[in-house]
């Protein structure tokens, strides 16, 4: 591991939720307004994840008042408070850009069935 990789590894967040493309997530974002800070929730479907390491980012799409809104978040950014997984989605693509053209029920994503392992 060279020096740059070591410095990047130190700055990466350790407690990142293991979400994938197709999952519905709730992202808690720090908003700074003047000298005040607040946390704003942004909930939607993860339609893509890019890059890796400290440069990793993901795109979340939600429908707000009938209009599709997409927001790109750097995964290891200090403005991200938490990323919570609301539901797991079952998709067979790495990028879900086709959801941009779909409306209503056609834009739904199948929910992944979770079967706990019996011990």
From Swiss-Prot:
Its source organism is Pelobacter propionicus (strain DSM 2379 / NBRC 103807 / OttBd1)
GO BP field: translation
* Keywords linked to the UniProt accession: Ribonucleoprotein, Ribosomal protein
Q: Which GO terms describe its molecular function?
A: structural constituent of ribosome
Lineage of producing organism:
Bacteria, Pseudomonadati, Thermodesulfobacteriota, Desulfuromonadia, Desulfuromonadales
Q: Which InterPro entries match?
A: Ribosomal_bL19, Ribosomal_bL19_CS, Ribosomal_bL19_sf, Translation_prot_SH3-like_sf
Protein purpose: This protein is located at the 30S-50S ribosomal subunit interface and may play a role in the structure and function of the aminoacyl-tRNA binding site.
> What sections of the protein cross the membrane?
none
Q: Which family does it belong to?
A: Belongs to the bacterial ribosomal protein bL19 family.
In Swiss-Prot or TrEMBL terms, this protein is called Large ribosomal subunit protein bL19
- Which PROSITE patterns does the protein's record reference? RIBOSOMAL_L19
One GO cellular component assignment for this chain's record is: cytosolic large ribosomal subunit
Q: Is Ribonucleoprotein given among the entry's keywords?
A: yes
* PANTHER family, sorted: LARGE RIBOSOMAL SUBUNIT PROTEIN BL19M, RIBOSOMAL PROTEIN L19
**Record flagged with keyword Ribosomal protein:** yes
Q: Which Pfam families match?
A: Ribosomal_L19 (PF01245)
Q: Where in this chain does the entry annotate a coiled-coil region?
A: none
């Amino acid at each position: 591991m060279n020096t740059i990789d070591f410095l990047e590894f130190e700055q990466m967040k350790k407690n990142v939720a293991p979400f994938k493309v197709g999952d519905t997530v709730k992202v808690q974002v720090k908003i700074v307004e003047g000298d005040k800070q607040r946390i704003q929730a942004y909930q939607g479907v993860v339609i893509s994840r890019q890059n890796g390491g400290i440069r990793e980012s993901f795109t979340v799409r939600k429908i707000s008042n009938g209009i599709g809104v997409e927001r790109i978040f750097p995964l290891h950014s200090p403005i991200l408070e938490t990323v919570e997984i609301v539901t797991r989605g079952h998709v067979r693509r790495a990028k879900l850009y086709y959801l941009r053209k779909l409306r209503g029920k056609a834009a739904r994503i199948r929910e992944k069935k979770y079967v706990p392992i019996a011990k």
